[in-house]
């Protein structure tokens, strides 16, 4: 899918970004995770392939991560959701959610947008369930 057709769905407030915890992983290094979901309608585009993408600035580097992919229904509606795993070396700034359609679209209706940091799992909760 071409980045040329990207449509901004929304910018995540910095107070939400600052609530996210950073985890250290073996393979990806430092990452932070966000739950992302959006109900959208792409007028006049039934069956259109689309992706939900998160874009952000990490220091001076522009990065992006795919969240979900799908096709719009018969009236052009779709729910896209997933966890955005964002590698970070410095600090996440200017976090934005974009729709990436396969073809150019003139108008989208954003029924709902949800972005929230993934809650870290407490160690004592893991042992209590074991």
Where are these regions (language model features)?
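Extracellular and organelle-lumenal recognition/adhesion modules and their flexible linkers in secreted
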Residues: 1-130
């Amino acid at each position: 899918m071409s980045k040329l057709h990207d449509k901004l769905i929304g910018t995540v407030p910095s107070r939400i970004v600052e609530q996210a915890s950073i985890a250290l992983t073996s393979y990806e290094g430092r990452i932070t995770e966000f739950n992302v979901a959006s109900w959208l309608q792409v007028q006049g585009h039934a069956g259109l392939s689309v992706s939900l993408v998160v874009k952000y600035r990490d220091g001076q580097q522009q990065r992006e991560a795919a969240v979900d992919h799908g096709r719009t229904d018969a009236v052009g509606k779709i729910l896209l959701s997933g966890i955005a795993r964002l590698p970070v070396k410095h600090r996440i700034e200017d976090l934005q959610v974009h729709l990436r359609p396969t073809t150019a679209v003139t108008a989208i209706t954003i029924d709902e947008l949800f972005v929230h940091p993934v809650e870290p799992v407490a160690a004592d909760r893991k042992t209590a369930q074991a």
